[in-house]
Amino acid sequence: MNLEQIYKDCGAYLEGHFLLSSGKHSQFYLQSAKVLEDPKLAAKLCDELAKIIASYKIEFDSICSPALGGILAGYELARACSKRFIFTERVNKEMTLRRGFEVKKGEKFIICEDIITTGGSALESAKIIESLGGIIVGFAALANRGFCAVENLKSPRKDNAKLPENLPLFTLGNFEFEIYDETNCPLCKKGSKAIKPGSRGN
């Protein structure tokens, strides 16, 4: 499966000057919503991701995703795995579990995102699940931006990665883009202003 080509064909592989959720800057951005707007394609991708997870014989009860980006991927993965799905969301900049969702003590979860960059949002969701008595057994995403180690791709962990080293991450592919702090961003130095994806229709 050529994940990069799928993103390009869907108009989801964007080039410009972007402010990522991590606060870093990048010349490229992956708009997974453009990929997941096609239900058949979303099902195909998450069916494949479910097969990868199953091949590692990871036992889990439920899937949790951080809103908003992770919801479609997480829901489709839960469907493919015949598991329950819940999501966390930000309220006043703090990740929370709302809407009557509950976590049973000892319930095993995979945290699913659309894209994993450093893994910060996924880790926030994981900490909420653990605080309620749940157990995190792994992480999953359609794609990894090259910072976190990916179990099924045998890709190494880099310094910016925030996901725990003792838990596996499963993805369909790696996109290795450079990301920059604002202070050393070459695009900023050229006078360009970073745009938060979604703020201008992207």
From Swiss-Prot:
Pathway(s) of this molecule: Pyrimidine metabolism; UMP biosynthesis via de novo pathway; UMP from orotate: step 1/2
Q: Known InterPro entries for this protein?
A: OPRT, Orotate_PRibTrfase_bac, PRibTrfase_dom, PRTase-like
Upper lineage is:
Bacteria, Pseudomonadati, Campylobacterota, Epsilonproteobacteria, Campylobacterales
Any keyword Magnesium?
yes
Gene name of this polypeptide? pyrE
Keywords from UniProt, A to Z, are:
Glycosyltransferase, Magnesium, Pyrimidine biosynthesis, Transferase
Could you provide one GO biological process annotation from this protein's UniProt record? 'de novo' UMP biosynthetic process
Catalysed reactions, semicolon-separated: orotidine 5'-phosphate + diphosphate = orotate + 5-phospho-alpha-D-ribose 1-diphosphate
Q: What does this protein do?
A: Catalyzes the transfer of a ribosyl phosphate group from 5-phosphoribose 1-diphosphate to orotate, leading to the formation of orotidine monophosphate (OMP).
By sequence similarity, the record places it as follows: Belongs to the purine/pyrimidine phosphoribosyltransferase family. PyrE subfamily.
Stated name of the protein: Orotate phosphoribosyltransferase
Per UniProt, orotate binds at T117, R145
Species name = Campylobacter jejuni subsp. jejuni serotype O:6 (strain 81116 / NCTC 11828)
Q: How does it assemble?
A: Homodimer.
Instruction: State the superkingdom.
Output: Bacteria
Keyword Glycosyltransferase attached: yes
